[in-house]
Structures are given as C-alpha cells and as structure tokens.
C-alpha cells in the first residue's frame, strides 16, 4: 500500500490528511470533515472513484468563507498524492475519461509527470451549492495539480445542474488520478528515464 501523511498549519487552516492508494478497482472513502458539507461530499466522490482512503481533519476560518479551507485542502491532498507516488516507477502515468453524472458530462485527462499545469473549462449557473462557493472548484483543482506535480485538463462539456456538473468533475479527476497511479511495471514511463 502506498500511503502519505501530511500536516499543515497556517493562520487560516489546520489540516491533517492521511492518504492510502488502494489496489486498482478498489472503492475508496473519505473519513473526516472539512466543515463544508458539499465539499465533503465531493471529496468522498473523488476518493470513492479514485480508489483512495482519505482520513482528513480540517479546521478552517469558515467565519470568513470557505476559500482557505478548500484551497488548502487541495494543497495538502496534492502534496500527499505526490508523496504517495514515490519515484513514480511503474505508474501508468497517463489517464483520461469521459464521465457522466446524469445530464452532466466531464472530460478529464491527467499526466502524473512532475510538471504542474491546470487547464480548467467549466461554468456554473449558481454561485453557491449548499455552503460551497462554485468558484472554489477551480481553486481546489489548481492547488491539487500544482502540489501533486501533475498536468490536469478538465472540461465540462455540458450540464444543467451545478451539483451534477461539480460532482462529475470531482469524480472524473479522482478516477483519472487513480488510473494514472496504477502500477504496471517497474520502469519509469518516460523516454528520458525519469519523471
């Protein structure tokens, strides 16, 4: 089992996260809470479909808003993914998916390469889902990508319901990262010989 434990404390958040990368096709889960119900639901979707067990404790300045909580959770989760990947020997590296959630459809592609990049193309009709600011989806994904050291492309092709659009995004990203981290050999998947 590949695992990573990360603690991060700032004046805005105090986060502990333990990540376990499960065997391919295993169902993961989130244990713990961020204090933002809808965000917890999205993280559980990410974990379930990606094959990750995530033990999480977050204390954030929710009296201000959810920005620091969501972004910093992305920083810590990205850091944990990078640590759990180790030297990346044998990982599949590339993965992509078209993922439906009812009427919403998301396209996602990832390269677990050590090169951080995010392309994000999604729009929402509402500003808020529960206590979750829809603008924070891109902030979370940027923090995740840059701290994991992955190239991440996300495009919402269509959808009417913001809950479905957002959930489709989180599930697609989780699924892609889980697939990219599957181990198929002992070689590093790069013509350069390193990632």
Please describe what each predicted stretch is.
Residues 1-195:
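Structural preference for solvent-exposed beta-strand-turn elements
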